[in-house]
């Protein structure tokens, strides 16, 4: 709580009168993210709302839903699904006078491959509602939260219990204490299991028959997954920071393999008890926490939990965390096979270490004849695996292919994303592709959120709790709180350091923004007149990196974010810096890079980073993106794509794309992560091009290093801008 109070003087988020033609803003008062108690729901209330009998707007909720309960009971069971596999399920029920609340209550459900609760070394259990003492099944909400990490209701479940909701949390098959083996993450079978659990919920005497789902990251993705199975009674979902197109966001949508996800695969294998990690590793460290997944109530001696682990150890796919990595593409399987052969091992742990470390991979290629050429020739195509092209009823899914089913289910969706999340675009694509009731909030936060002493992260936890409650009150209890009568979109505009303010729009993208072109000019100047027949060159630095704690690493548990010296990073490639901005403006949407270039190698990776430099010389990262030249052919997206560039990336397109050479310039176009940022008078923009982001994407150093030449007259940066209204 003290951390929040320290931040209170920083919080101010008043909306100024909009310019003509701009969307009318929602009501925003002076933001007070330093709540006085965990159940405070007046974070963004305007002064008159604080005095009113009832109030309902983003971050402001009172008088519509009365808090009635101050305690809860947690019980844990095994629930069999249709094929008899037993899944571990926790049920949290509000208590009145020490007894579960009478009558049938609406249920909020959370479901994923993550642990539903954790047994700590002292015998206590960490839950979504704080911590419970050894053997304890009932607790005051206040006391459980106070015993938990941070003493806060970060998941908002305490608030839901207080307002008369039952909370159910389940572990997917093959994870945690659940039995069974996995058919890949986000599988069709996992969707059916989720449907079976909802059917079980609705058969219970305490359930009203109306269910909503909440959660972020995988827990957000699993909401879309379960909704695609159209379970009876699932009315609304609240998915946060959920990826949409796995190939594009997490796999290889630009042709460049994302390797940071190896840390996530390795971590989950350790938690599932099928791998042990490596001491001293940054990507796959040994687990020294001495924690375990919580047992169900009847499993007094832990034998059932251990039996579930033994079952998954018998499955080759479960034992090897690389399975999800390789099933998406034969080329990925060949990548792993080639590196394993060069190392003389089939064990996943050392292969992961080499894949993650560009120097280690380069050293291995120097020792293994022909390895560099074989790895360079690999292409990661969109149509290499069925999951990237169509819905899978059994195996792993690319959720974008399920969007039509989700819309057809009729479920209401509140998409919740952050401008500093790794999957920012995905949240916007979920909104664009849903054809049912929907709402969208894009905040200033990361994937976690877990940045210490950062107002933007505090806002994420505070606002999420309130918006969850407003959403489920409307859909599960029929409370007429107006959540669908407000503007459909809330979005934060980032300012200086951890500052931001809020805007609204009737739909995404907001109106009034027009593309502004910034030429890549001579003398590394961004903007101004184009440079006819001029070029700029640089040599690939394969160690160029935004570090090991980027927005991407934060998404897999390697946060908080911490970027390196961005001026030093700019010197590892080629950069263009604008003149100081005269009149301020807002930039909201996806920056787009257009390049005309030649290369000394037939294929090459291009990474772009967009930054803001204030009058004092402080550099702020805004966005980044990348493209492998062999994936430059554009094609139709299989979903609504917000008018952005879309790399075809299918095998036929790759085969039809000519290689790069040093004489014939080729056109590359790609988008960077969307953002919403205000630039003030005196600020400058900088665009940085490099040949690698060595700790985030697979980097295969070439010998000699690639030489790039950018043809300036046909190269530019396009930004969606409008005049600042603050």
Regions found by a protein language model. Give the residues of each.
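Accessory cap/linker subdomain of secreted extracellular hydrolases
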Residues: 25-56, 62, 117-119, 125-157, ...
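N-terminal cap/lid segment of alpha/beta-hydrolase-fold proteins
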Residues: 57-103, 581-583
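Short glycine-enriched nucleophile-adjacent loop
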Residues: 220-231, 595
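Active-site-adjacent alpha-helix of alpha/beta-hydrolase-fold enzymes
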Residues: 425-439
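Short beta-strand/loop motif that positions the catalytic acidic residue
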Residues: 415-417
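Alpha/beta-hydrolase fold nucleophile elbow
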Residues: 205-217
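Cap/lid segment of the alpha/beta-hydrolase catalytic domain
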Residues: 98-202, 452-456, 614-615, 623, ...
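C-terminal, loop-rich substrate-recognition/catalytic regions characterized by aromatic stacking residues
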Residues: 25-48, 304-363, 457-726
